Swiss-Prot record:
Keyword Disulfide bond annotated: yes
GO BP term (any one): defense response to bacterium
Disulphide linkage map: C31-C52
Top-level lineage group: Eukaryota
Pfam family, one: Anti-LPS-SCYG
Gene3D superfamilies reported in the protein's UniProt record: 3.30.160.320
UniProt keyword list: Antibiotic, Antimicrobial, Disulfide bond
Endoplasmic reticulum in keyword set: no
Function text: Binds tightly to LPS and thus specifically inhibits the LPS-mediated activation of the hemolymph coagulation. It has a strong antibacterial effect especially on the growth of Gram-negative bacteria.
Organism from which the protein derives: Limulus polyphemus
Name this protein carries in UniProt: Anti-lipopolysaccharide factor
Length: 101
């Protein structure tokens, strides 16, 4: 499970420099990232979304109290779904991580 955690944190580290939305190359696919602030029960929340429409219909989503938490958990949600469906192999994860470390 360590490689998947490393993959998530490598993606998050790269997406954290983007503010509310942006595009990101992930495993040779163009992916998109968006964070939207919302006000819920008298508190600010952030809705995160990570998706790669030219590659898969999988969408990672999360709502958290911090912007960074929304980024992390939407990526975590995407990677979990992609791993479960066999879309991302361990070798691909290792290669992606090695590009950024």
């Amino acid at each position: 499970d360590g490689i998947w955690t490393q993959l998530i944190f490598t993606l998050v580290k790269n997406l954290a420099t983007l503010w509310q939305s942006g595009d990101f190359q992930f495993l040779d696919h163009e992916c998109h990232y968006r964070i939207k602030p919302t006000f819920r029960r008298l508190k600010w929340k952030y809705k995160g979304k990570f998706w790669c429409p030219s590659w898969t219909s999988i969408t990672g989503r999360a709502t958290k109290s911090s912007r960074s938490g929304a980024v992390e958990h939407s990526v975590r949600n995407f990677v979990g779904q992609a791993k479960s469906s066999g879309l991302i192999t361990q070798r691909q994860a290792e290669q992606f991580i090695s590009q950024y470390n």
